[in-house]
């Protein structure tokens, strides 16, 4: 028992020694010195860290990407974009395709002419393909840049203005396609027809990035039949590039291409691939949306 009392007294004395006025073996002065040391030490570390970050930020621009040499070519996005990129519906049953047309209507609201009336934010860039629209350097001294208008009506049968079902009720579905944004990227039209499929060569024209859709599987040849393209030059016109970023180009509207499959084989799953072609457009097996996209469409008629 006496041993326990001695040990109890030992650790209690270690915690607080009333004779020496020590807490955990240190006097108040000692504790003050060591705390002061760590405050100064970690304060200096924090100052070095903050200074390094600040120096790095001074080398970066809020408007212009510093390093773009490893940026991949832009991808293609399409609407509707269901899970697994599969569009399946019955043209006689509204509820089977309403979810697709609803998403398309919401997406195209930004392209309503009434949303592009502000002369300080938007400008007309022509209804025919043109060259790049340069609006100065990627700096803030010029201020916010105007955006080219893109009229929804240019998508014609796929605009949703006359046919609010976007062709779905007739078994002729539309897909709206856009080229994803990359700051200061200038897509270059193909400079040679060698890399373009024979059937797609007719779509090559000046100042346009062409897009072409075909069957993915050889056994589906002949089942896709007629495909219509709507938009400026039936592709992506160069006057909508470059994009200056969110801060300098907040109203920017990407040019759209509407693709309508007007004569699909009914009650058959078709896998379709759409590609854009350009000198600085590449493809990747790891990214199925880089410069292209695959989609499965099944139109039921029973």
Swiss-Prot record:
The regions listed as transmembrane in this protein's record are 31-51
InterPro entries of this UniProt entry? Na/K_ATPase_sub_beta (IPR000402), Na/K_ATPase_sub_beta_sf (IPR038702)
The induction comment states: By seawater acclimation in sexually maturing migratory silver eels but not in sexually immature non-migratory yellow eels.
Which key words tag this protein in UniProt?
Answer: Cell membrane, Disulfide bond, Glycoprotein, Ion transport, Membrane, Potassium, Potassium transport, Signal-anchor, Sodium, Sodium transport, Sodium/potassium transport, Transmembrane, Transmembrane helix, Transport
Q: Name one GO biological process term.
A: potassium ion transport
Question: Where does this protein chiefly localize?
Answer: membrane
**What post-translational changes are documented for it?**
Glycosylated.
How does the protein associate with the membrane? Single-pass type II membrane protein
Gene3D superfamilies named in the record: Na, k-atpase alpha subunit (2.60.40.1660)
Cellular component GO terms, alphabetically? sodium:potassium-exchanging ATPase complex
Q: Which GO terms describe its molecular function?
A: ATPase activator activity; P-type sodium:potassium-exchanging transporter activity
Tissue specificity comment: Expressed mainly in epithelial tissues.
Compartments annotated for it: namely: Cell membrane
Which pairs of Cys residues are joined through disulfide bonds in the record?
A: 125-148, 158-174, 213-274
The record places the following residue ranges in the Extracellular compartment, namely 52-302
Query: Which of this chain's residues carry glycans?
Result: 193, 263
Residues on the membrane's Cytoplasmic side span 1-30
Q: Which domain of life is it from?
A: Eukaryota
What is known about what this protein does? This is the non-catalytic component of the active enzyme, which catalyzes the hydrolysis of ATP coupled with the exchange of Na(+) and K(+) ions across the plasma membrane. The beta subunit regulates, through assembly of alpha/beta heterodimers, the number of sodium pumps transported to the plasma membrane.
Protein family membership: Belongs to the X(+)/potassium ATPases subunit beta family.
Share what the entry says about its subunit structure, partners included.
The sodium/potassium-transporting ATPase is composed of a catalytic alpha subunit, an auxiliary non-catalytic beta subunit and an additional regulatory subunit.
What is the name of the protein in this document? Sodium/potassium-transporting ATPase subunit beta-233
